[in-house]
């Protein structure tokens, strides 16, 4: 056990060092310490005015109150050793917040009072001091921390409800004059060793209900008979993990909790919108508005009034005995109850941790037997004591037992619910897959209806098996309604998934049809036209003029056929008209996206240039009868080229806008797709591509949606096409000129006549002749093996190396002679002109291009 060292006790004549950890405000003999003002001066609280806060802790002995304060505020209150179970804190102790890491996150000048625990064996039945100390803490503190264990929630004495009742009663009599003077405090319940089995919200509700009932039973002064506990107290709740079993989580939770001890304001406008676990603790209405320099006298006056008041008498011995025995009997019967129920709770908890809640067989029989046994045993042994206490304890026991059984039942129903929904979903999916594998049409609605009946029947059997006899709360009608609703939701989701898959299959069919049909229409550009016979002005052939009309007609016919397929198949899913409307609306939007993607593919730079070139060559390379032209110098190549080029150029504006030839306007896409059905959800729209003219929030008009080629792209396409056409023109021009620039035949005869002597000399000389044959054979072999390139590169490399070696030898020769060094020095000092080193000259004696590039890099 760690005692309170460096604390100033009552009546001690101590120096400043003795106040290092705090002061004893009231000793175990109810004597108030007159040195409280000295301690507050040392801690520099006296000059703070109203800028201070007072917190007290309240709870049973040996429940870790001092330990909690030490962790929260860095204090050094005495705590109990693990090996002993005896009283540590005697009287009331005070210390200032010492937490260094709190920093600016915590409020300034937090004073903490550690109050002697209740229900201690050292005082036994003498509960006078614990009531007076609790009343003192309640009357002086802004925040009263009620430290209780999780298993004490719902108890009367364990949760100190009896003591709180007396404290509330006397507090009203002593300190509340009328309804206009209502000082408010915060009762901050810290629930220790919270395992998470019972949610904090449930524990909070239990404590709140107990306090409300407690308040309704106390006697109130005249004029306050109808007052409510909420008028005098606010409540806050927090749960902390087990300190021994979960030390890291405990310290983490305490650190987080300590940061809440700061000043704040509870804005009614944000009530319910802010997480209660992060709200500041200190509110303006809690402060007693006593200046710090007057607090010692105020506290001493409060204590004097409490000590000399006679209303704090103990309950009768009969009631105390009844409370003790009923609590003891309750604990005994709960031990047997735990032997049956605890393993079931552990199994459910383990299944929950594994993420696989399972239905426990024979759970209902075990719960009914355990409940009947525990109530019968308690009645047999406890009904002999005080009837009022017995009835109250019986109700408390029933609440504890039913709370645990209700949790078991609820988890069992949840497990049956979850497994039933999963089985239903799996069964429907398996039946659908089986129908798809057979290749035959299947009735989705019939499959869903059959599997739903099986799932509901199974859930009903499992729910009936866990009904608790005599328990008003044991009913599963609500759960069955929720289960039916979830099955309907799953059915709707499966139907939507099936319709999505249907829509995907139909979209693929639409894409394949449009890819083929629209591609053929674009391939018709330029076909069926004679070359120079094509009109430069006037009506265009159908392949160009009606291109967009044909594309739109193909598109609408294809989608209409797809809509019919979709509607016929959706009827077998038992889909509602709203779902069908949404599916058709999505299909039209998706189909337009497919068409637009196909158009963009056709007018991609490479594809459109190829089509324009084919269009141009069809007019330029072929005559009126479609016969390829053989260009002659006498042909009017320039005229034919100009007509063909200008005619092809006019195709670009035609492709730039999706317009119908009859109306010279874009097709009525917005009317064709239609408005979104009223039943469309955000999930239905999240994968849809925005369409101009329909989705106005995208800022894109219908005209922009129908723009296939922008002005900039048209200009770029025009330039590229002209370059391509110019290349074809130059090629044609060369072929025409090439026919008259052949070598004359007489030149070959003249070459043979003039070189006849040399030919005869080589043929008559065996050496020359053999050498010529060997050279020819070597050249052929080299050509066959593709070695000309490597040989040329090797020759170039060898010559370059020889040149470098020659330069180096020349440099060494010049450096070895006096005249050479002078010449080199003079050459290096030339102020003007370009210096060209020898190793930077190419084979022609000129500066190497690579050297010029390196010089530019140096600059």
Curated annotation (Swiss-Prot):
E.C. no: 3.6.5.-
Annotated spans, Disordered: 525-544, 816-859
Lumenal side: 764-766
Family matches, as InterPro entries: G_GB1_RHD3_dom, P-loop_NTPase, RHD3/Sey1, Sey1/RHD3-like_3HB
TM segment ranges: 743-763, 767-787
Keyword flag Transmembrane: yes
Cell compartments where the protein resides: Endoplasmic reticulum membrane
Coiled-coil regions listed: 476-496
Pfam families, A to Z: RHD3_GTPase, Sey1_3HB
Single GO molecular function: GTPase activity
Keyword Disulfide bond assigned: no
Membrane topology note: Multi-pass membrane protein
Binding residue positions for GTP: 59-66
Cytoplasmic side: 1-742, 788-859
Residue spans of biased composition, Acidic residues class: 850-859
Function: Cooperates with the reticulon proteins and tubule-shaping DP1 family proteins to generate and maintain the structure of the tubular endoplasmic reticulum network. Has GTPase activity, which is required for its function in ER organization.
Family under the similarity heading: Belongs to the TRAFAC class dynamin-like GTPase superfamily. GB1/RHD3 GTPase family. RHD3 subfamily.
Protein name stated in the entry: Protein SEY1
Organism: Phaeosphaeria nodorum (strain SN15 / ATCC MYA-4574 / FGSC 10173) (Glume blotch fungus)
Gene name of this polypeptide: SEY1
């Amino acid at each position: 056990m760690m005692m309170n060292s460096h604390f100033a006790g009552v009546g001690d004549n101590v120096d400043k060092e003795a106040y290092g950890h705090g002061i004893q405000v009231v000793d175990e003999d109810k004597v108030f310490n007159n040195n409280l003002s000295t301690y507050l001066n040392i801690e520099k609280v006296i000059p703070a005015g109203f800028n201070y806060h007072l917190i007290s802790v309240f709870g049973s002995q040996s429940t870790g109150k001092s330990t909690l304060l030490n962790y929260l505020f860095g204090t050094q209150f005495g705590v109990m050793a693990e090996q002993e179970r005896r009283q540590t804190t005697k009287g009331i102790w005070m210390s200032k917040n010492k937490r260094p890491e709190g920093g600016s996150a915590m409020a300034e000048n937090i004073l903490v009072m550690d109050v002697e625990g209740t229900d201690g064996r050292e005082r036994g039945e003498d509960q006078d001091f614990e009531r007076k100390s609790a009343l003192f803490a309640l009357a002086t503190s802004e925040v009263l921390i009620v430290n209780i264990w999780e298993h004490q929630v719902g108890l009367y004495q364990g949760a100190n409800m009896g003591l709180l009742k007396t404290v509330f009663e006397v507090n009203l009599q002593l300190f509340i004059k009328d309804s206009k003077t209502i000082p408010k405090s915060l009762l901050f319940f810290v629930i220790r060793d919270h395992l998470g089995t019972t949610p904090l919200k449930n524990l909070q509700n239990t404590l709140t209900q107990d306090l409300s009932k407690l308040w309704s039973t106390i006697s109130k002064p005249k004029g306050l008979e109808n007052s409510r506990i909420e008028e005098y107290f606010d409540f806050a709740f927090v749960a902390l993990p087990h300190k021994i079993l979960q030390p890291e989580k405990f310290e983490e939770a305490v650190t987080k909790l300590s940061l809440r001890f700061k000043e704040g304001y509870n804005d009614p406008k944000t009530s319910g919108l802010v997480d209660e676990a992060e709200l500041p603790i200190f509110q303006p209405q809690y402060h007693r508005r006593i200046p710090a320099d007057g607090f010692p006298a105020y506290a001493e006056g409060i204590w004097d009034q409490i000590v000399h008041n006679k209303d704090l008498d103990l309950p009768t011995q009969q009631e105390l005995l009844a409370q003790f025995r009923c609590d003891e009997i309750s604990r005994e019967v709960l031990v047997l109850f735990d032997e049956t129920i605890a393993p079931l709770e552990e199994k459910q908890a383990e299944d929950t941790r594994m993420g696989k809640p399972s239905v426990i067989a024979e759970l209902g029989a075990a719960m009914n037997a355990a409940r009947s046994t525990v109530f019968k045993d308690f009645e047999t042994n406890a009904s002999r004591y005080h009837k009022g206490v017995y009835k109250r304890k019986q109700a408390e026991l029933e609440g504890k037992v039913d709370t645990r059984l209700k949790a078991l039942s609820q988890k069992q129903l949840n497990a049956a619910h979850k497994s039933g929904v999963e089985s239903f979903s799996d069964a429907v999916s398996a039946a659908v897959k089986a129908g798809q594998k057979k290749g035959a049409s299947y009735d989705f609605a019939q499959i869903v209806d059959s599997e739903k009946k099986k799932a509901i029947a199974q859930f009903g059997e499992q729910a009936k098996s866990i009904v608790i006899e005599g328990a008003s709360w044991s009913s599963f009608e609500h759960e069955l309604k929720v289960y039916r609703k979830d099955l309907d939701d799953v059915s709707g989701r499966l139907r939507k998934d099936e319709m999505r898959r249907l829509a995907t299959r139909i979209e693929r069919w639409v894409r394949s049809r449009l890819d083929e049909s629209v591609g053929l229409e674009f391939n018709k550009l330029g076909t069926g036209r004679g070359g120079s016979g094509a009109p430069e002005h006037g009506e265009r052939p159908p392949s160009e003029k009606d291109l967009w009309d044909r594309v739109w007609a193909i598109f609408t016919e294809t989608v209409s056929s797809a809509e019919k397929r979709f509607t016929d198949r959706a009827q077998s899913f038992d889909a509602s008209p709203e779902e069908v409307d949404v599916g058709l609306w999505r299909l039209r939007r998706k189909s337009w996206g497919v068409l637009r993607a196909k158009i963009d593919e056709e007018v991609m730079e490479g594809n459109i240039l190829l089509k324009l070139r084919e269009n141009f060559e069809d007019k330029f390379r072929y005559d009126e009868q479609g016969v390829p032209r053989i260009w002659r110098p006498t042909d009017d190549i320039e005229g034919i080229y100009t007509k063909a080029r200008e005619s092809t150029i006019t195709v670009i504006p035609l492709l730039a806008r999706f317009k119908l030839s009859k109306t010279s306007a874009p097709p009525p896409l917005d009317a064709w797709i239609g408005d979104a059905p009223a039943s469309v959800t955000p999930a239905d729209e999240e994968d849809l591509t925005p369409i101009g003219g329909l989705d106005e929030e995208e800022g894109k008009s219908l005209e922009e949606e129908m723009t296939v080629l922008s002005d900039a792209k048209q200009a770029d396409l025009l330039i590229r096409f002209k370059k391509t056409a110019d290349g074809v023109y130059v090629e044609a021009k060369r072929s025409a000129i090439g026919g008259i620039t052949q070598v004359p035949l007489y030149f070959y005869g003249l070459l043979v006549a003039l070189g006849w002597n040399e030919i005869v000399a080589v043929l008559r000389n065996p050496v020359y002749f053999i050498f010529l044959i060997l050279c020819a054979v070597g050249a052929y072999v080299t050509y066959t093996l593709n070695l000309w390139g490597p040989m040329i590169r090797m020759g170039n490399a060898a010559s370059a190396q020889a040149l470098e070696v020659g330069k180096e030898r020349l440099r060494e020769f010049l450096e070895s002679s006096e005249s050479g060094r002078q010449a080199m020095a003079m050459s290096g000092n030339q102020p003007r002109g370009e210096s060209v080193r020898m190793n930077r000259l190419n084979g022609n004696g000129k500066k190497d291009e690579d050297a010029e590039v390196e010089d530019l890099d140096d600059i």
